[in-house]
């Protein structure tokens, strides 16, 4: 199917959500109101229900979007929980820490749920949700490891970068220790290499609180 064919199908509302995503488009939801019809993209409609998505790489762009949505939802209702749905392979440590700090900063509890994969900073943010409100779907995979980095240039510059990544490793391990209840030494050992877990294993480790198969 060509792009023009797909655009023709969109015009007749016959294209699937998957096909629209292939074009970089987002499905729309039409609601009836006293003033007539109003159309929302699906993510804006779910934002009204206090659902925020972190999907794909954690970078400055995705972090800015998540931070803005958390702050907006706090201003809308500071006493109602926010749900953060995560399907991410991880990414930038600084961008992830910006999201983490905002999750702790806002007044509402931030519930976290892993769907698909939460790896690296994705797993870190999953574990950073409100205690008792961190969950995963049954076939989710969760992976923790130490921060990755590289440096080039003069020896003194490489030394500076090495000190920084070692600091970040210690800081991330300290936070993971706080949110999981595991000793820092164990966190350091377990994150030395990629450490994959099932949902049930993540519960035992303290990264999440429960595995959810169906809505209650």
Swiss-Prot record:
A GO term (biological process) for this protein? protein quality control for misfolded or incompletely synthesized proteins
Main localization of the protein described in the UniProt heading: cytoplasm
Keywords recorded for this protein, A-Z: Cytoplasm, Hydrolase, Protease, Serine protease
What does UniProt give as GO cellular component? cytoplasm; endopeptidase Clp complex
UniProt subcellular location = Cytoplasm
> Which PANTHER family does this UniProt record tie to the protein?
ATP-DEPENDENT CLP PROTEASE PROTEOLYTIC SUBUNIT
**Which residues are annotated as active site?**
120 (nucleophile), 145
Q: Can you state the subunit structure given in the record?
A: Fourteen ClpP subunits assemble into 2 heptameric rings which stack back to back to give a disk-like structure with a central cavity, resembling the structure of eukaryotic proteasomes.
The answer to whether UniProt assigns keyword Repeat to this entry is no
Family label: Belongs to the peptidase S14 family.
Highest taxon of the lineage: Bacteria
Query: What organism is listed for this UniProt entry?
Result: Cupriavidus pinatubonensis (strain JMP 134 / LMG 1197)
**Catalytic activity of the protein:** Hydrolysis of proteins to small peptides in the presence of ATP and magnesium. alpha-casein is the usual test substrate. In the absence of ATP, only oligopeptides shorter than five residues are hydrolyzed (such as succinyl-Leu-Tyr-|-NHMec, and Leu-Tyr-Leu-|-Tyr-Trp, in which cleavage of the -Tyr-|-Leu- and -Tyr-|-Trp bonds also occurs)
**What are the EC numbers?**
3.4.21.92
One molecular function GO term is: ATP-dependent peptidase activity
Q: Which purpose does this protein serve, as stated in its record?
A: Cleaves peptides in various proteins in a process that requires ATP hydrolysis. Has a chymotrypsin-like activity. Plays a major role in the degradation of misfolded proteins.
Q: What is this protein called?
A: ATP-dependent Clp protease proteolytic subunit
């Amino acid at each position: 199917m060509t792009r023009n064919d797909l655009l023709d199908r969109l015009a007749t509302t016959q294209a699937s959500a998957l096909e629209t995503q292939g074009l970089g488009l987002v499905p729309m939801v039409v609601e009836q109101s006293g003033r007539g019809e109003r159309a929302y993209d699906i993510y804006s409609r779910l934002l009204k229900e206090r659902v925020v998505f972190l999907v794909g790489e954690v970078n400055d762009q995705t972090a800015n979007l998540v931070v803005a949505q958390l702050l907006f939802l706090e201003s809308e209702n500071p006493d109602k929980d926010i749900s953060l749905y995560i399907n991410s392979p991880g990414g930038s440590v600084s961008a992830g820490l910006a999201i983490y700090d905002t999750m702790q900063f806002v007044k509402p509890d931030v519930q976290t749920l892993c769907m698909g994969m939460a790896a690296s900073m994705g797993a870190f943010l999953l574990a950073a949700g409100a205690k008792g409100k961190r969950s995963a779907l049954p076939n989710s995979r969760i992976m923790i490891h130490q921060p990755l980095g590289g440096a080039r240039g003069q020896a003194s510059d490489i030394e500076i970068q090495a000190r920084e990544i070692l600091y970040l490793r210690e800081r991330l391990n300290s936070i993971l220790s706080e949110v999981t209840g595991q000793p820092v030494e164990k966190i350091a050992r377990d994150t030395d290499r990629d450490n994959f877990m099932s949902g049930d294993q993540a519960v035992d480790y303290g990264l999440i609180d429960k595995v959810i198969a169906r809505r209650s």
